Amino acid sequence: MSSKAARRRAREFALQGIYQWLLSANSMLLIEEHVSQVSGFDKADRELFISLLRGTLNNVDDLQAEFAPFIHRAVHELSPVERAILLLATHELKHNLDTPYRVIINEAIELAKSYGGTDGHRFVNGVLDKLATQLRVTEVSAGRS
């Protein structure tokens, strides 16, 4: 298992790749290649980065459909950073079941604080907290009892 810091960096680089894809619509492989050459990538968990980037970009419509009911505007009206964070975290909530939902939400909040707008982290937290109650029913109810 990789270190917490390496996993955090993998999420940061995956976020950068998703953001690039949202703005440019470049191919996933081109983005993957570009991001993997950015300074500091050697300290990231490469396997997790690839899994997050590919898993998210291959399922954008399904992932957006999961969080869309919890936002009060159209998905395309979200800032690209918030949208990318929600896509990434939704993918993790659905597919990385070995990662606790609270870790996923906390990592998303930290990404929003670093890269998002002033209150973006509050928005991301609210959406993901509601989404987790649907995608991780047993885990969330066990944590709240």
Swiss-Prot record:
Disulphide-bridged cysteine pairs: none
InterPro entries referenced in this protein's UniProt entry, alphabetically: NusB-like_sf, NusB_fam, NusB_RsmB_TIM44
GO molecular function, one term: RNA binding
Pfam families linked to this entry: NusB (PF01029)
GO cellular component: cytosol
Biological process annotations from GO: DNA-templated transcription termination; transcription antitermination
Keyword entries, A-Z: RNA-binding, Transcription, Transcription antitermination, Transcription regulation
Gene3D superfamilies xref list: NusB-like (1.10.940.10)
Function: Involved in transcription antitermination. Required for transcription of ribosomal RNA (rRNA) genes. Binds specifically to the boxA antiterminator sequence of the ribosomal RNA (rrn) operons.
Family membership: Belongs to the NusB family.
NCBIfam families assigned: nusB
Name of the protein this chain belongs to: Transcription antitermination protein NusB
